[in-house]
Amino acid sequence: MATNARILGFNSPSALVAAGDDFLLGAGGGIVIRRKEESSQWIPCEGRYAIGALAFSPSAGLLCVTEVKLDVSLHVFRFPERHHLQCIDNVATVDVQHMLFSSDGEMLALLTCIPTTCVTFYSAARGNRLVKCASTELGGVFCKHLTFPLHRHDCIAVLEPHGVRIACNMDSATFVPSILTLSSKGHYFHSCVWGTEGLYCGAGRGQVVLLDELRTDMKNYINCETPHNVTALLQNGTLLFIGTECGDVFTYNIDQKAQRLLVRLGRSVVRLLTLPDVNDVLVATSTDVTKISVDTAQSVFVRRRSASDTVKLLVLGGLVVIVCLDGSLVTYDQDTNTAGHTPVRFPEKVVDACVVGSVAVVVYDSGFVRSFTVENTVSVVSQMKVSDCPLTACTSDGVSLLAVCDKNVVHFIEVADGLLETAASSDIFACAVTNLRWAVNGGRSVLAACNNGEVHNLRFTGKCDSASAGVTVDMTWRLDFPVNDFLPLYGDGDVINIFVHSVDKDTKMYALERQRVKESKPLRPYFLMRDHECGGNVLQRLGGDSIISAGGDGRVVVRDISHYLMKLPPVPPTKEKKHPLKEFLLRPFGRGGITCLSVWNAAGGFVCGGNDSVVHLVPVGKSPIHYSWSEPFWHQRAISTSPSRASSPSDAETLSAERSRCRIISALADLRMEVEKLLQERTPTVRAEDFLLPEQRQAFNEECEMEIHKAREDDYYSLVHNEFVQHTIKTECWDVMEVQRSKIVSMTDPETEVHNFHLRKPCAQRAKIQKKIKLMRAIQIKTEECFTLSSLVKRAKEGNLCTEQQVCGPPSDVDELLYDTLDVYTGPRATIQLILLECKILHEKKSFNIRFDTLRERKSRELNLIAERNGRCVRIMQQLGEHTCPPNVLFTPVFDIEEDPQTVFEVFDSEIDPELLKLAVKSDDGELVVSPSDEAALKTWMDGLEKVTEVLRVNVPIPPFADNSLEQYVPPEERSDEQQRIFEEYEKEVAEQTVLINEKKELLRGEVAALVKANMTSAKAIDDEIDVLRTDRMLVAQLVDELELHQVNALCLFLLKKTIRNKFLGVKREEEDLLCRLRQLDSLYEYRLKLYLASEARVQDCIEEEKNMITDMRCLPPFTDPDWGERLNRRFTTWRSKYEDGLAKVPEPTRSGVVPIPLWEQYCQCCRAVVEARDKIIHLRGEADALNDEVVEVETEKKKAQFALDDKEKAEEACRKEVIEKVLDIQNLYTLQQGQVQDENAMVSDDFTDFSIRWVKNITDYNDLIFASFDEIRSLMSRSSQLRQSMKTCSWETERLLYCIGTLEMELRQLHTLRVTRQMQETIHTGAVTSLEREINKMDARIEAVRSVMSKKVEERNRVISKLKMQINDRRAENQYLNNQVQALTNSVEDKKAVWGMLGEHNNDKDRLRERMRELYENSELEELARCQQEELVRLKNEVDRLREATFPSFAVVTRRTAR
């Protein structure tokens, strides 16, 4: 058996480099070096911290290693000597995203992305020490990759998700690195590499995008035949290697434009690295590192790891089984040195695993338990779902019994030949179970530890003939702290000794006494040890007298426990004085350290792993551990399922899949026949929904309820949104207005209307300021001491002012206070002008609103008069006997509801959808709901009801004998004289009344015409006034606009500085971009010029070689032949000159002519040599010309960039001059010479005809004032320079404080990282779920469940409370009745005692004793009855309190306070 330890797996693909024939991979805190088939481990640093990234420079022989601590340190080694040269601390805060050397090894670049993206550059100085030369911040964009250009180290490309940033001038000591940003259009980049033609970027769907560095544009370069993303790129010579997300590796020949598929790996390609052999390439995928031969497309595994983190390590027979988080299994056989990876495609995550007999049992977070055999092939023997809750831990007796637990339930499962069968379960736990361990006393007992520190001893009773298996709780103990892991050491009938890794980071030994009375006081440990700095994670038994433990510090400790394997006397907690037997530092600190450990063999060997894919295999537990091994042979193994053991033999799963399928098919056939028969019988009456299954019907009902609930919820939120919008409008646009919006509409034309002006509510503070400004301005005008430019300007006419203000309204009190436009050139004056203009605008608006209100009141009065006239017309028409009025009689003015300002928040029936209005008219109870508009119309109609108007008509009663409708009717020929006389009088009276009625009707019709005319006249008058008011409003609006423009002009003085500053900053920003572009072009120009000069030198060398070759040919055959040499030389010279002119061809050996054949062949060889040399020169000349064209192209771009930069510099200078002219208020100063006579108004007058004479003394005074102003300017300029210097000092102080802030933020992030790390460790140790979304879903489900349960409990509590109240009332009545009986009995006893004493019969001792005994018996019975009733009351009260506490926990607090 090999005694050397070995390591499986590696940290990440970023911790991979190829150094000559060696492959270096970071594994934990060390580096695995593979050379050919042998591997070894090298600990470059302390080994306590993980290796992050590796970078190697073959030219300089430097190896850079990052060590991830609380911050990141960079170590520099000389390799392969492994000599430590340098350590640079704090190169990154969390981790290094990418680290890369330039092609010449002179520059190292580090990319960090947390807290912000930063690229740091180090140059290799003398002595091969790295010196930081530059650092560039890229902001908050997450970058992925770095790449240097070929044969250059002064620039680098940084890959972003949607673009590329190019940093230039990294090696310049004068300039800081300049950044050029190039964004893509519709591409998401995953990888990049700098090649010969430019920057290649890998995008989605197999696309490779080429970035042209000169033109700064992108174009599609290659389209690979794959739908996956391009995740890795590498150029090696003329081949471009392309790695994809699906594991395909393509090659693309840049010269031939040919693409081919090299190999399919099946795993996502992460990195591609070059090797010393140009025919090989190193491919790093997510799970392995492979060397691929380009010619043969054969692959050789360099190193491999599992696809996910390690959860459990098992030793089954001679195999080491690695159980991964995703369910995959990795087996390692030491005898054959082979490792097999078996992917298990289950959607669950693995929680724990253990060995039962010859099978491995794995538990999942979905509640499933599966058993596997791993001897020859990995196969699933059995599976079953134990619980709906996620499982947390498992343990076994190693033979046939398995115990698993979810949150609060422990399940016992019997295992027979790998078949799983549920035996029993126990749910007596109040808290979550975290750890399970099998007892050591040989019985079927399990110790279960909870997260509150309790340890329960569960005994599995087994099956019998009459009953099923059961679980009993023998004993419960409470420890002082919860445990991370524990291990039973010794057990008998009295005590159980356990070894514990506690959460307080101590290792302890407890004695669990079986006879101990249950107390609330926790147990105290017997011995305390501090084996692990960060606390222990796992414990295992190592032989009979020792244990092996591992912790978060990455150490494995072996300790002797022989003195714990007995019953110990009770002792106070003491510190263990014995030191561990062995200590091994195997894994780095962080990420939980060692989380899984298993004993390998009887020689003290063990295997351990953590929350990654690195596994240490130590065959012999001796110190020190020597790591040297041959890499195992990896093979992929497929999982198989045993047909007879694919399911568990429980109640519903005992039938095989084939039998179930046959039964279902037969049942479906019978059901199909019954359905066809039923359809034939009841086709007309059967509905389609009758065939729905109950589950489908229930699902449909649930969907309907969900849609109804969603609709109601949407309606509710829309109503809430509408209310919020109305509230916002009312509070921010209505309540703040002193005068709300309103309008007046013409009586005849609805399009003619006039609006008022909105006015906000006055502010008291603003009114005070306005009052003070007016007073100050009035005092300023009165004193006339202020200088004004307007006084220097001559006006054509003093009274030629804008007269629109006079026609718009009365003059304002601020008209005389306003500044002239020319005088508003300082900040204070602009402020005063703004306030005065605001007062002026407010005055104009108020003046117009007064006229508006006057017209509105008048219109209201006229509308009332028109309504009265219309009413009079209606009554007149009724008197005239017409029931309906003609349209031309009644005047109907135009009505607009918006004339009332309050209607803005009212909704009328005309604004509602008629369909919705029909639904809203009737309420649910069938009563008619009258809308407000209908109610107002009804009120108006009722108010208009009056007495019936008498109609004007002839009202003369006809005599009865003349009415043919009566019985007294007498025909005219039969009437008497008297009747004839009466009828004549009747006719006469009818004629008179007819004339009178006609006259009244004519008068009424004239009155109607007058009323109609009056209505039209008043309406026309109102309309004319509205037109006039509209004109006035237009003038006022124009005046307000003009005043607001003056406000804008005054406000521009305040905004001028900011505007000029923004303009200046924009120009500077564009200038910086152009400068970065120019520096990048300079770098590109130098690189291409260097290539051109090298190519030109190669051309000259080839020309010299050709000349030397021709010269040397003269001394070689055939030109040395004495007969033909001179002739052939002349012929060769002639041929060469003609061939250069294109007039001759290469001679053929078969056409020798008279020349001897051997000499002619030699002559032809010389010609071919010349042709080959000439072709080589032409080819090199073409390359040189192409490079020259590229240089010229770069020069052209540089000129364009330089011209643009010059333009930006001119724009910058213009901005500076604009600042001097506009911001500093500079005016031209005119110096008057001594004795000069000049008019100071001449420069602003139309001509020089008007001037004034000045004395010489006045001129002298003016000059003195000018010189004094120069002195003042000098003082101001010095003061401004001092202020500028102080501003620079403040800027420097600000930068220093910002640096201090950055330092403090960095320390805060480090502390936060430490806290998050510790929280992650606690989370991993406690087994809590780390998915926030899952926790939120669980909490939501928990809330809903608690809500439903609590509602049921509330209802139950109310029923119980009412029942208890009734019982209490009954008990009270019963107690009152019993008290009355007791009182009556007491009185009777007292009376009998008195009578007895009077009679003297109590002297009989026998009777007295008998009565005394009976009295004592009665008293005891009554006392017992009272005690029972009191206990009953107390029990009922406690029941009420318990129900309250269970239903609402806050009631429990109130109950306690009340009890106190």
UniProtKB/Swiss-Prot annotation:
Residues 1170-1214, 1399-1446 form a coiled coil. It comes from the Eukaryota. The keyword Transmembrane helix does not apply. Gene3D superfamilies: YVTN repeat-like/Quinoprotein amine dehydrogenase (2.130.10.10). WD repeats lie at residues 46-87, 91-132, 184-221, 303-342, 428-468, 529-569, 589-628, 911-951, 1129-1170. GO terms for cellular component: axoneme; cytoplasm; motile cilium. GO terms for biological process: axoneme assembly; cilium assembly; cilium-dependent cell motility; spermatogenesis. InterPro entries: Beta-prop_CFAP43_2nd, CFAP43_N, WD40/YVTN_repeat-like_dom_sf, WD40_repeat_dom_sf. It is found in: Cell projection, Cilium, Flagellum; Cytoplasm, Cytoskeleton, Flagellum axoneme. Keywords: Cell projection, Cilium, Coiled coil, Cytoplasm, Cytoskeleton, Flagellum, Repeat, WD repeat. Belongs to the CFAP43 family. Flagellar protein involved in flagellum axoneme organization and function. This is Cilia- and flagella-associated protein 43. It comes from Trypanosoma brucei brucei (strain 927/4 GUTat10.1). The lineage of its organism: Eukaryota, Discoba, Euglenozoa, Kinetoplastea, Metakinetoplastina.
